[in-house]
Design a protein with these regions (language model features):
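Extended active-site neighborhood of metal-dependent phosphoesterases/phosphodiesterases
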Residues: 64-185, 200-206, 210-222, 230-277, ...
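Hydrophobic h-region of N-terminal signal peptides that target proteins for export
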Residues: 9-18
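Positively charged n-region of N-terminal signal peptides that target proteins for export
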Residues: 1-4
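N-terminal active-site segment of His-dependent metallophosphoesterases
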Residues: 17-74, 167-168
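Residue-level marker for buried hydrophobic side chains located in beta-strands
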Residues: 23-25, 56-58, 95, 187, ...
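Residue-level signal for glycine
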Residues: 290-292
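Generic beta-strand structural signal
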Residues: 25, 58, 236, 276-281, ...
Length: 300
């Protein structure tokens, strides 16, 4: 078994060793270490020993169920600090809010940046450029829950959503993309634009109506999200964008089908590796055994 894992790690190392920027992508993981969260976290750490990851992109629902109450909530330890304790995961984490964080104190999620050195969250939505020797990728982090009507219509379960201005975020996104000059542009959010899911259709139609036209107009390379708890790669006809659903890093939803434009699906849990050179951007989907299930590639 150890030899098998070592072989897998060598394959991952070979897959990212030539990249100038390499990032881990994880989401939907906060389950106190259960439902494979802890083993997957340990696998991420072992892979980080072999590959020079610059940061972790945490795409929401770091805390499932009711979010957190404060920066001192014990869930910070049981969902995050104790679970992702590997020395090689003590790198910057760039998070966004998921719908489950909105059931609790969202300001505490931002304020945790004052508690944890690795928790880098300057705002509810923001932009970050990662640079290699001869390439650059801009990652734009969205706060998608306020962009979806159903959360505004449920103030009892999502009490602070109505305080957020969707129009301001969308105007910011348009301006940010218009000014972007990096080699690669990746937009990340918690909710999908396209996906097969039993969740509310309204979530996707609102994202298609409000976010997708901006992304298409500026011809971004990838949109990466979580929320659905399985892996999906979708390339709808007429869109220049690769739409990626990253699986849960704990409890996944095994049943997943296809929609128009589906390239790949898997119900396994796991995480992804986003990497790039000047000529290639790719995302490797990794399962809980460390196997590469599918690779999304874009070339210049």
């Amino acid at each position: 078994m150890k030899r098998f894992i070592f072989s897998i790690l060598l394959l991952i190392w070979a897959a990212v060793s030539s990249a100038q920027v390499s990032l881990l992508v994880t989401n939907d993981m906060g389950r106190n270490g259960y439902y494979e969260q802890k083993p997957i976290a340990e696998l991420m750490g072992r892979m980080a020993e072999e590959a020079d990851f610059e940061a972790v992109l945490a795409l929401g629902d770091v805390h499932h169920f009711m979010g957190v109450e404060s920066v001192d909530d014990p869930l910070w330890m049981t969902n995050y600090e104790i679970i992702y304790s590997h020395p090689e995961l003590q790198i910057p984490w760039y998070p966004i809010l998921g719908n489950h964080e909105y059931r609790g104190n969202t300001q505490a999620v931002l304020d945790y940046a004052q508690v944890s050195r690795r928790w880098q969250m300057p705002a509810r939505y923001y932009s970050k450029v990662f640079e290699g020797d001869s390439t650059s990728v801009r990652v734009i982090f969205l706060d998608t829950t306020p962009l979806i009507d159903k959360y505004h219509n449920d103030p009892q379960d999502y009490p602070t959503v109505r305080q957020q201005r969707a129009d301001r975020q969308l105007a910011w996104l348009d301006k940010e993309l218009a000014a972007a000059r990096e080699d690669w542009i990746v937009v990340v959010g918690h909710h999908p634009i396209y996906a097969d899911t039993p969740k509310s259709t309204e979530e996707r139609t609102d994202m298609q109506k409000r976010v997708d036209p901006i992304l298409r107009r500026h011809r971004v390379d990838m949109y990466v999200c979580g929320h659905i708890h399985n892996f999906q790669h979708i390339k709808p006809q007429g869109s220049p964008i690769d739409y990626v659903v990253n699986s849960a890093a704990s409890l996944s939803r095994q049943k997943v089908g296809k929609v128009e434009g589906t390239v790949f699906v898997s119900g396994e849990p796991g995480f992804s590796i986003l990497s790039c050179t000047r000529k290639e951007l790719k995302l490797d989907m990794i399962n809980a055994r460390g196997e590469i299930l599918h690779t999304v590639k874009r070339n210049k």
